[in-house]
Amino acid sequence: MVLGLLLAVAVTIDIRWLKNRHKVLNEVYVAPVYLAMGPTQSAEPGSGTPYALNNRLAVADAIGLGELEGPEDVILDEGDHLYCGTRHGEIVRFFAPDYTRSEVFAHVGGFPLGLAFDAHGNLISCVGAMGLYSISPEREVTKLTAETTRSLTSINDDARLRDPNDLDIAPDGRIYFTDSTKRYDAHDWALDSIENRATGRLLVYDPKDGSTKTLLDGYRYTNGVCMAHDNRSLFFAESWACRIHRYWLEGPKAGHAECVIRDMPGYPDNINRASDGRYWMAWLGMRTPTFDLSLRHPAMRKRMARRLPQDEWLFPNINTGGVVKFDEAGQIIQTMGDLGGASHAMVTSMREHKGQLFIGGIFNNRIGRFAIAGADPNWTGPRAYWGGKR
């Protein structure tokens, strides 16, 4: 009889939990946390700092103007053809040399974000709210992974990839990628900035056995990923904290991460290699004193989220971005922007190819292109990564 009573109580508790679980989670999900951002250098034009924006992106040539919605990332193949994702779940290919002709290369679904070619010519993509996908040269779409190991302390199942964002591929074929937040799907990515909880993670997918492993956890919106030129480490962006980290794959620091750039005036997005041994980084937006102040007052943000309609919330300034070049040590080399915001206000990606830089933006309706002064006119990403393998 006692056992029967215990079972009845357990069932009752379980039913009440299932019925009210959403209320508990909603209470948690509207609870922003405290963050004190460090002081930063000015990005104002003419300020004389390494971050001072110019107007270089404003005069970039437009590719696919009016044909595209949301080319978050861009990439080029060995034939100089240009690829990007769209918010309609498509991978679009623009044909070289003038990029005036295009086609839907593949329909993946979701929102294709980060892109990378592997050694076999497969186009690998982080697809928002869906997972990591591969598109073969024959356009066959294959899901690689959609989950990782669940955290032991999680109330909600966080094994599913909610916002897979960017990726890069090591020489051994392993795919390193970010899942920006455990709390929001890709279409609600900006809401993560309001709470600013450290739930972003860095993961690795091994094609040899199909396994997915979480390498790092507890970052504020992990974003861009880029293998270092020597492949002994990788860089990844922590957007809401305005930092760039290096994760070591080899050597005495293997398995450990260190911050190489901190307290930037902009929110970092994708990172890619440059032909001169340095790296390109996109800024999706710029810090403001008002939003920085709000991060120190989580109660205010909680009241805002509960009492105001979303179109009246205070969000980060994602209407002004840019492109930054930095070196192995994290020193800033140059910064470029679109001061008027007419062509490339928000930049989420850039890709160097044969002396030109191609610009993508998740809220944009075009891809930008301009010549890079002093760049190697023969350098390409596929050749730098895979040499004569393909």
Where are these regions (language model features)?
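Conserved beta-propeller blade signature
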Residues: 81-83, 122-124, 174-176, 233-236, ...
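Surface loop/turn motifs at the tips and blade-to-blade linkers of beta-strand repeat domains
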Residues: 62-67, 104-109, 144-160, 215-220, ...
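Blade-loop segments of beta-propeller domains
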Residues: 87-134, 145-154
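Blade/loop signatures of beta-propeller domains
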Residues: 17-61, 196-197, 320-322, 326-329
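Asp-box/WD-like beta-propeller blade repeats and closely related beta-sheet repeat scaffolds
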Residues: 126-192, 199-200
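Short, conserved, GDST-rich strand-edge loop motifs in beta-rich repeat architectures
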Residues: 177-197, 284-317, 369
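Residue-level detector of Asp-centered blade-edge/turn motifs that repeat once per structural unit
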Residues: 76-79, 117-120, 169-172, 229-231, ...
